[in-house]
Amino acid sequence: MPTIKLVKYLTVTAAVLTLATAPTPVAAAPEPVASEAPLQATPPAAGTWQPPLSTRGRYIVDAQGHRFRLKSANWDGAQGSWTGNGSTADPANHHAGQNSYGIPLGLDRASLPELLADFHELGINSIRLPFSNEMIHTAAPVPDAAVAANPQLSGKTPLQIYDAVVAALTHDGFAVVLNNHTRTSRWCCGIDGNERWNSGQSTPQWADDWVFMARRYAADPRVVGADLYNEVRRDVLDDPNWGLGDGHDWYAAARLAADRILTEANPDLLIVVEGINWTGLPVDGLPHGRPTLTPVRTLSHTLVNAHKLVYSAHFYGYTGPRHSGATGVGETHDPRYQDLTRDQLYQVLADQAFFVTTEGQHYTAPVWVSEFGSGAGETGTAARTWFGNITDCFADHDADFAYWPLVGWEGHDDWALLRYDTAGRRYGILGQGDWRGPAWNHLMTSATRTGYIPPVPVWRMLNTGHGDEVRSLRVRAGGDWDPGAYKAACPDGLRLTGLSHTGGRGLCTDTAAGDLRAAGNAQTVVTDERYVPAGGDWAGGYTKLQCPAGQFLIGYSRRGDRVATALCAPARTSLGLTGRTVWFDRSDNRPTDGAGGDFASGHYKGQCAADEYAAGIAFTTRLGAAAGPAALLCGPLPGLTAE
């Protein structure tokens, strides 16, 4: 993670970005190592939160609906420490001179019980636990010296040691978020062959490893999340993107992995999607920057479970909104975060990340700042001021966070909250004289919302720009209702309430009625006007796809720009037969409160009111007119209690 060594690395790589060739892929990794299954955790009686975790608006909650604020730290090492130069056997070629041997740091210096006791003393409740894909497939055991303080781990592979660490953490009451940090076991994050999830491997291979890991810990309910990939960024030649539908589309890849994890491995996991960390060339006058979560404003994820999405972002003082963190050659004249005033920093964090926590939007989700940090040896006024300002911002925003890093070696990595010497003596932020202590203590003890979080209306977008967006598992169980068409269906529990005239977007919600659908998987595919009652022409001159009486819209399909079908489901209660026509082929026609947000930026949109359901779609195929949705039939919801 970002430190002075990384800055030097970025400086060198930035200078050769336009000249270097693409990195050579490494050989394919072997199949996952057959090893003993991880221990199933038995939470201690003192545990006060009940897994699994889910989301309600901007908050993460436990199984009882109580707030669970991620007060986390990153226990790194299993993602690799080698810097990419020289022999891996030489400690000097590892970050800060610390050879992690592909396992969490500190196991050579302190026993697991001692480490966990120190973690508790910090006040954290959760651990982001990085790993590399290489770690999963490494068959060789680590040297005994790497686990000298934990001889029970002698002879084990990195994955088996990762198992033991997960089991120890969860048994002690910590929540664990698995983090796929890198592909190879190499220190992150520069031009290092680990820039994207599919650098040196295919997207299906990456997703396969995620299914493997999620299944591996599925029996441990305190393994609560899957953080899909770390700091997606430009490689030598190409940028990642958010929604272009190509092989560099991080938005689509994250959706694919989330789908597979939730449907094939563990439906209880939170899915953590980090924004894009860097695009462009860090050269004055050329496009470059740190998009972070800004693309989410116009294109957000909709998972098969509408209550499992968490977005994340990383912030370090020496990087910036358009500054890579490099020094010297390759450095631009853009401000670093630590160059910003307090007010400017607060605004930038809002613009880049915390806007996602705004309630009532299609993108509303918790935001976890899953990396930030600074060194105990930092003497710069700007860097120290930044650390105080950003921790104040987290406190003021009641944000979820994870410090980087948690554990290091004394005399090596002074960024670590806890450092241990070869005799196991502890140093760091819990001792006297660490300038970071007051800011850390303020963050850990500041006022925070606790207790029961009431359910809030959910809004989620549908996007058929590059293919199907069938988010309902009940609909999937019924098979392909319109082969060859692009299809979309709301997640189970939500109904369709809005459509765009062009672009294939939709908006789903549960507002006012909760889950409106009746039990079972019955659904109706509407392809013509057979369900339009006599005398009920609500869109004269237009083709109308109307649900049967007692049913409501949950999905749609299109062929090119033309509406193909409407997908309807029976309601759990009787629905009225009256309705109104909402036209949107010439302008937006949405409720004045803007609920759900702009789910189809740049396109005309129509949307039923919060106390209505959508019962039909009208469109035209006349020459010169767009054949997309032109009107919705919106009917009044009966007096329902949200479920």
Task: Go through each PLM region and give its residues.
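Secretory targeting and sorting signals
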Residues: M1-P32
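N-terminal carbohydrate-binding accessory modules
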Residues: A29, E36-S126
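Extracellular glycoside hydrolase catalytic/binding regions
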Residues: P52, H95-P104, D108, N198-G200, ...
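Active-site-proximal beta-strand/loop segments in catalytic clefts of secreted hydrolases
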Residues: A63, A73-A78, P130-E134, N179-R183, ...
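Surface-exposed, active-site-proximal loop segments in enzymatic domains
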Residues: N85-P91, H95-S100, N133-P158, R186-Q201, ...
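An active-site-proximal structural segment forming one wall of the substrate-binding cleft
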Residues: N99-I127, M135-H137, P143-G225, W250-R260
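Aromatic-rich peripheral "rim/lid" segments of glycoside hydrolase catalytic domains that contact
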Residues: T379-W459
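Lectin-type carbohydrate-recognition ectodomains
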Residues: W459-E643
